[in-house]
């Protein structure tokens, strides 16, 4: 993915997050709480790093363009909402009834967010960005994400 566009990189991450949700569902069905907790911790770190790198690359560019600003602001607010859910989940007994209910809400909101990005925001932004800009933003995202993963793991 050396020359992948920002949208390719973000979609790849979204697909990995969907796979983590599927693995968590499998672990829950198997009543494997230890595996579920590991997968959830992995999801938290991944999603936190993804959001930060996305905001530093694509969203920063979109916020600087009047015709894209509103969509970027909306997505930033959704990132904050997911972050708030993750904080609330940290305060609940892992895999308890309240935790499972809050997790289901967070999952629904997150899946809505990435679907909205892929189906609405990315196509709109792609019309405004050149192929060179998309590639440059993809490289910036790829550069920022490892640092953000490290930071997210340290916070966890």
Question: What are the residue ranges of the model-derived segments?
Answer:
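Small-residue-biased structural context
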Residues: 1-156
């Amino acid at each position: 993915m050396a020359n992948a566009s920002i949208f390719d990189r973000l979609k790849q991450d979204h697909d990995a997050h969907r796979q983590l949700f599927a693995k968590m569902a499998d672990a829950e069905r198997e009543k494997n709480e230890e595996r579920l907790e590991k997968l959830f911790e992995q999801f938290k770190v991944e999603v936190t790093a993804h959001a930060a790198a996305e905001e530093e690359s694509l969203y920063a560019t979109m916020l600087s363009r009047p015709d894209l600003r509103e969509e970027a602001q909306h997505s930033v607010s959704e990132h904050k909402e997911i972050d708030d859910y993750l904080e609330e989940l940290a305060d609940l007994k892992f895999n308890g009834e309240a935790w499972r209910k809050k997790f289901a809400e967070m999952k629904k909101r997150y899946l809505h967010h990435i679907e909205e990005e892929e189906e609405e925001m990315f196509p709109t932004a792609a019309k405004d960005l050149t192929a060179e800009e998309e590639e440059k933003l993809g490289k910036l995202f790829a550069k920022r994400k490892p640092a953000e993963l490290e930071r997210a793991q340290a916070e966890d």
